[in-house]
From Swiss-Prot:
Similarity comment: family membership: Belongs to the universal ribosomal protein uS17 family.
Function: Component of the mitochondrial ribosome (mitoribosome), a dedicated translation machinery responsible for the synthesis of mitochondrial genome-encoded proteins, including at least some of the essential transmembrane subunits of the mitochondrial respiratory chain. The mitoribosomes are attached to the mitochondrial inner membrane and translation products are cotranslationally integrated into the membrane. uS17m may have a meiosis-specific role as it accumulates during the middle stage of sporulation.
GO BP annotation list: mitochondrial translation; sporulation resulting in formation of a cellular spore
Gene3D superfamilies: Nucleic acid-binding proteins
SUPFAM superfamilies, alphabetized: Nucleic acid-binding proteins (SSF50249)
Disulfide bonds: none
Predominant location: mitochondrion
Subcellular compartments: Mitochondrion
Protein name: Small ribosomal subunit protein uS17m
Amino acid sequence: MARQNFLGLVVSQGKMQKTVKVRVETKVFNKKINKELFHRRDYLVHDEGEISREGDLVRIEATRPLSKRKFFAIAEIIRNKGQQFALYESEAQLSVAKEEAQKAKEFLDKRSVRENKLNEKTTLLRDIRTIQDALSSGSTPKELLEIKQRYGIQDFSQETVRQLLQLDISGLEVNLEKQRSLIDRIQTRLSELLSNDLKCDQFLKDHGVEDPLTLKKNIKKNLLRKHVMMDMQQPSQ
């Protein structure tokens, strides 16, 4: 006597040892509407080798009752989509972990640069205060020797303090000028792209935006500004 066979999809695995849940679709004729309908039924199926994965298309075959609800076993894996997905999932997890590690490294590098710049400014202000204290008290602490070497100063006076303050202000002015120049270049580039739809769409495509023609005007402008800013800031990183 031929054994009963079904084709089904593995919808659950790993919850019970050597057992998977397989969903089988069969056509059932409905007399009320005089039409065939798909009927779904889930079977608990024995998987001796525990090789089937969720998403696999399998052929199940009737066997002796293995438990109260389990009387089918995996006979053949027709299509191992579940195993392919499991492999893809593990590779995706590794890829995401690498990407997160790279982003974390970039963040820490940027923070380190900011902290170094802040430390330089703090050191300058601390040195100015040390010089002022030394001038008011008439003493020459050991720190003054280090300050001389750091800035190439021969003698300490109020003029020295003014020069160091000017050095700090000059640094701020340079940074401010750089920011202004960057903003001007971004605005110029943005205006250039917005005035030419072909250039604008090609620019977005080159930066990974799919089908920019279908985007709303405000969304397109925001994406354009984002990628222009990233391009302009890239050389300075």
